[in-house]
Design a protein with these regions (language model features):
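Long, contiguous internal "core" modules enriched in hydrophobic/ aromatic residues
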Residues: 5, 11-13, 32, 76-77, ...
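C-terminal structured interaction module
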Residues: 275-310
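N-terminal juxtamembrane cytosolic/stromal segments of multi-pass membrane proteins
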Residues: 1-3, 65-69, 300
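N-terminal signal-anchor module of multipass membrane proteins
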Residues: 1-52, 284, 296-297, 308
Length: 310
């Protein structure tokens, strides 16, 4: 598939915002106290990321003014369900921020609702792709696992960076081990998906498409002399070397370097925020690379006709 940066930005930003809110909700339910300034900054950042992600997703629409119609098919469409859950989650985060601004503590019900809506939003987003059975790379439970784990890991690392900056040592001590654990878990899940995808074989072949029973069928032409929607939207047009470099960025910047920085901070006993912000700075381009590869690796069956030419 051709990765659209608007969708990549939306899923990375929204996923990290969900993870950040989940970390705050778990801290609230676990009785870990957090200062008003920290909560305002963390919830405000989550709101900005959610709104920015939503704005980025509009750039992918051919007719943005018709976006409201996307919610009409909620009974059968995971995209419609996402369109409903995302504003609900954003509104809940805004309500929490307002309560923090007024100096009130978050009710237990609000924290539980935040956890539930975050989980539901990950489900809706992942199922948009996992429900497409004809794209083998996506049609697997690992799609949901990876969307959830990557969001939790990035959000938890961001929560630790903010906690270190605001001197919230109790919250940092509670969240730091989870940030490292979730980063390794997300790395393992993404590696498992990459290994699985590398071994997939197309279910359709030139022989099955044409009905020719010859052992070897060679396609000589696409049947067209110019580009079209099919050749633009369903193939990334990047070289094998470029894809390999993106894969290196995924592993190195997205997971290995942030994990190394977190381990170094833990072993040195340092609570300086620089370690955590360096981890965030490394993780952002790494996760953009991860999400680009997620889309680029998806092989649409139509590419057997439009892309395989001798």
């Amino acid at each position: 598939m051709n990765p659209a940066f608007s969708v990549i930005a939306f899923t990375v930003l929204a996923g990290a915002a969900q993870g950040l809110v989940v970390a705050l909700a778990c801290a609230a339910l676990g009785g870990v106290a957090a200062g008003r300034g920290f909560l305002l900054a963390a919830l405000g950042l989550a709101l900005v990321m959610l709104v920015a992600g939503l704005g980025a997703s509009f750039l992918h629409l051919g007719r943005p003014e018709r976006a409201w119609r996307a919610a009409a098919m909620w009974r059968t469409s995971w995209l419609s369900r996402e369109v409903i859950v995302l504003p609900a989650f954003t509104a809940l985060v805004a309500l929490w921020w307002l309560l923090a601004w007024r100096g009130g503590a978050a009710p237990t019900l609000l924290a539980v609702a935040a956890l539930a809506l975050a989980a539901l939003l990950w489900l809706c987003t992942a199922q948009i792709y996992a429900c497409l059975r004809f794209i083998q790379e996506w049609a697997h439970p690992l799609t949901l696992v990876n969307y959830t784990l990557v969001g939790l890991a990035s959000g938890c690392v961001l929560a630790c960076a903010l906690a270190a900056s605001f001197g919230e040592r109790a919250l940092l001590a509670a969240a730091a081990p989870w940030a490292l654990t979730l980063t390794f878990a997300a790395w393992a899940g993404r590696t498992a998906a990459l290994l699985r995808n590398a071994g997939l074989k197309p279910k359709s072949t030139a022989q099955s498409a044409t009905g020719i029973r010859a052992e070897r069928v060679v396609q000589k032409s696409m049947g067209m002399s110019a580009g079209a929607f099919n050749t633009r939207e369903f193939f990334h047009h990047a070289s094998a070397l470029a894809v390999q470099r993106v894969r290196w960025a995924l592993h190195g910047l997205g997971f290995a370097l942030p994990a190394a920085l977190m381990i170094t901070a833990a072993q040195s006993g340092s609570t300086h925020p620089a370690w955590w912000w360096l981890a965030v700075a490394s993780q952002v381009p790494g996760l953009l690379a991860e999400r680009w590869l997620f889309f680029a690796q998806a092989r649409h069956p139509q590419n057997l006709y439009y892309q395989t030419v001798s």
